[in-house]
Amino acid sequence: MANLRELRSRIKSVNSTKKITKAQELIATSRITKAQARVDASQPYAHEITKVIERLASASSLDHKMIREPKDPKRAAILVVSSDRGMCGGYNNNVFKTTAELRKLLEDEGKEVVLYVLGSKGVTYYNFRNENISGSWTGHSQDPVYAETLNLRNHLIGGFLAGSEGTVDVVDGVNAEGDQVPGFDEVHMVYTEFHSMLSQVPKAHRLLPIKTVVEEEKMELGSDMVSDSADQVSAEVDFEPDADTLLANLLPQYVSRGIFAALLEAAASESAARRTAMSAATDNASELVENLSRIANQARQAQITQEITEIVGGASALGDSGESD
């Protein structure tokens, strides 16, 4: 049986670890509420700018590369959204697995893949495997700031507009080797979508070129151009300035919206994954302390029994010695 002193030392160590995991669980729980609120607050803007882009795309004759399908894409960029910190279960591994699946799919289509990584864990993961990273950003996974996404957006749009035949200058805030990196014809993003406290699903999404879905309105006999709903108006719209100018200026904003929304989802998912992992770790620590305490009690009882046996044996020996005298 294990030494009683060693058991007590292990119990003390596990209890110390339990305090850390419990604190991490409480911190993650508080962050989830804030992250969920930010995700919900971003939805109205995302919904409205999507409707505006679709309306402009239907009214515009602009042949912009950001909304035009490439004829022969040769290189695709993947933005991998990971975390800056660990202790979040399989959160990062699920992202890396989805990235590997997307990468294989793109390579099977004959496209060269370049990686852009957001989060220290992703940078460490790919550096350890000697994977080339074209650019990285760190320090913003838990609390993304919209202004910080602008450098990321500008770099990705610049690389996309340059195309696979060109190069793009590295903008401020991007960690990259050299002052220029190759351009690309597509931009994909892999991040974790928040569904609930217990469900976070890695998702692969094409960011550029933008897919615009314009739904044709069906008119029925006797209906007019104004919907019964107050927020759905189907009348013709005059744009000021013209639709082409508006669309060209709104497309970068739309990309920013897509990136920031994904980062908010990822932040909420990271906190939820960390809370789940830390809750499980705390429960395991409690169970381990209980088992170690039981073993320690058994060891203590065995020690006491042995001491009593030795005392009784010693007393008997003294008694026998006295009788012989």
UniProtKB/Swiss-Prot annotation:
Q: Which InterPro entries match?
A: ATP_synth_F1_ATPase_gsu, ATP_synth_F1_gsu, ATP_synth_F1_gsu_CS
SUPFAM superfamilies from the entry? ATP synthase (F1-ATPase), gamma subunit (SSF52943)
Q: Name one GO molecular function term.
A: proton-transporting ATP synthase activity, rotational mechanism
Q: Which Pfam families match?
A: ATP-synt (PF00231)
Cellular component terms per the entry's GO annotation:
plasma membrane; proton-transporting ATP synthase complex
Q: Is Mitochondrion among the key words of this record?
A: no
An example GO BP is: proton motive force-driven plasma membrane ATP synthesis
Main role?
A: Produces ATP from ADP in the presence of a proton gradient across the membrane. The gamma chain is believed to be important in regulating ATPase activity and the flow of protons through the CF(0) complex.
Q: Which family does it belong to?
A: Belongs to the ATPase gamma chain family.
Protein's name in the database: ATP synthase gamma chain
